[in-house]
Amino acid sequence: MSEFSQTVPELVAWARKNDFSISLPVDRLSFLLAVATLNGERLDGEMSEGELVDAFRHVSDAFEQTSETIGVRANNAINDMVRQRLLNRFTSEQAEGNAIYRLTPLGIGITDYYIRQREFSTLRLSMQLSIVAGELKRAADAAEEGGDEFHWHRNVYAPLKYSVAEIFDSIDLTQRLMDEQQQQVKDDIAQLLNKDWRAAISSCELLLSETSGTLRELQDTLEAAGDKLQANLLRIQDATMTHDDLHFVDRLVFDLQSKLDRIICWGQQSIDLWIGYDRHVHKFIRTAIDMDKNRVFAQRLRQSVQTYFDEPWALTYANADRLLDMRDEEMALRDEEVTGELPEDLEYEEFNEIREQLAAIIEEQLAVYKTRQVPLDLGLVVREYLSQYPRARHFDVARIVIDQAVRLGVAQADFTGLPAKWQPINDYGAKVQAHVIDKY
């Protein structure tokens, strides 16, 4: 767990005094990654200057840079890495001119971010949580046993500070890396949809499902172990309440509790945000499909009219009498059944006016649920509204009610992944499947 004992002015003065600075253009960063990769293949973790020059040569060739000044540029790059405390140089009088180089903690941290921490592993997270659970249980047992100050430092404070806190930081880093991966997936989906949304649908579905599954897997693993971890932290906290000289342990336990709560809460929040993005992408795809169908129909109709004199055509339509003995006399055909899906500009103006009036009335009536924070059962509400209108308008009224209701909030049961029960909404067999909206 990150903890700063110095104040901000002290840290600023310290950084200025030591002339700390990092400048890594893409070629220098590539060189550092190459050094880290080659260094990982060696048991001793040491590299000679000649090996660094060879690594620089590979990077220089990849960037199509001239090879005539390779020695000078490699020497400048190595010296720059040493100056920025990314590499440590060791020399000896016996082997003058043959220096040995090792990556510094700063260099390892930068390369580790780019190389090793890019993959999410449920097994790795489970092992980390298992280690944390074991350390916390031993620390809680030691806290309940009690002892002198040395006992608290060695058996309680040290495991919490140098094992549990560091693993919590590692899990937090994993979440932040997944935040970056989510943003990268969003960029990939945007590029796919901008190129050819027809061919991109399957790829988008794969990216969305993989990211959603990874987030859910991470959160399920955290929540499964979260209660047990919090219980052991509470045991330690209860044991320190009777000791006035253990403020340092109590403060550390509080920090760990806050860190664990933050990790679990952000995991759930990231899932909620991703669900919203998933719905947004699917809505965009559905809109694109509808627009494309109407665009193709309009294009064919326009082309047929333009080429009428070259290729005449005839339009035949049938207007058969209604079978009064087989149909309800009061039933009116809806426009959608006759014309199919049409753009809003081609819909009947009268129906638009009626729909807008109904939407305004229903929106005002449903707002009471949000104001009073009362759960909204869509099945009951839709059934109540449909009982006030003729059967021919049931579909349109139900659609308006549902559109206005989902704008008020969401159902927390949607996030459980369990399907809602089907509820009848009229006496003619129509049903709706929706959870109770309880989060506005």
From Swiss-Prot:
Annotated segments matching region Leucine-zipper? 208-236
Provide a GO biological process annotation: chromosome segregation
The record's keywords, sorted A to Z, are: Calcium, Cell cycle, Cell division, Chromosome partition, Cytoplasm, DNA condensation
Q: How does it assemble?
A: Interacts, and probably forms a ternary complex, with MukE and MukB via its C-terminal region. The complex formation is stimulated by calcium or magnesium. It is required for an interaction between MukE and MukB.
Tell me the Pfam families matching this sequence. KicB, MukF_C, MukF_M
Which Cys pairs does UniProt list as disulfide-bonded?
Answer: none
What role does this protein play? Involved in chromosome condensation, segregation and cell cycle progression. May participate in facilitating chromosome segregation by condensation DNA from both sides of a centrally located replisome during cell division. Not required for mini-F plasmid partitioning. Probably acts via its interaction with MukB and MukE. Overexpression results in anucleate cells. It has a calcium binding activity.
Record-stated family: Belongs to the MukF family.
What is a GO molecular function of this protein? calcium ion binding
Localization per Swiss-Prot or TrEMBL: Cytoplasm, Nucleoid
Its GO CC terms? cytoplasm; nucleoid
Q: What is this protein called?
A: Chromosome partition protein MukF
